[in-house]
Amino acid sequence: LMLGGILFGWAKPVPVNFSALRRPKQDMLWVAVAGPASNLVMALGWALLYKMAWLNPDNYFAEPLLGMAGIGIKINIVLMVLNLLPLPPLDGGRVAVSMLPHRQAYQLSRIEPYGMFILIFLAITPVLGWILMPLVSLMYQLLSLLFGI
C-alpha cells in the first residue's frame, strides 16, 4: 500500500505464547534465533539454486533463475543481518535480552516500545546502511566462497 509516496506497512512479529515456554528467558533465545536462522537457510537455498543455474548456462531457465536467486540471496542476507541488530523488538534485541543479566536485560527491554521508531529513524538516515553493509558484505562473501559463485 502506497500512502503519500511512502511504503506503509511492516512485517508482523510471530505471536509467541510466553506462558508455554518452560524456561522463558532461555527459550526466548531459541524463538528469537529461529527468524534469522530461517533467513540463513533460505539464502543458502537460493545460493544453491544460483550455483545450479550458473553451471547450466545453456538451460532456457538459467538466466531468470540467476536473477531470482541473486535477489533471493540478497534479500535474505539483509533480513538476517537486520533482524540480528540488538534492538528490541527485533530478534537480535530479544537474543540480547535473553543473554544479559537481569538488570541490563530489563533496561534493554524497556526500549521496545520505541524500537520501531528508532529503526525507522536509522533507516531514513545513512546510519542503518553504515551498520548493515559491512555485515551484509561479509555474509555475501562467505556465501560466495562456500558456493563458488
Where are these regions (language model features)?
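Hydrophobic transmembrane alpha-helices and their immediate loop junctions
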Residues: L1-I149
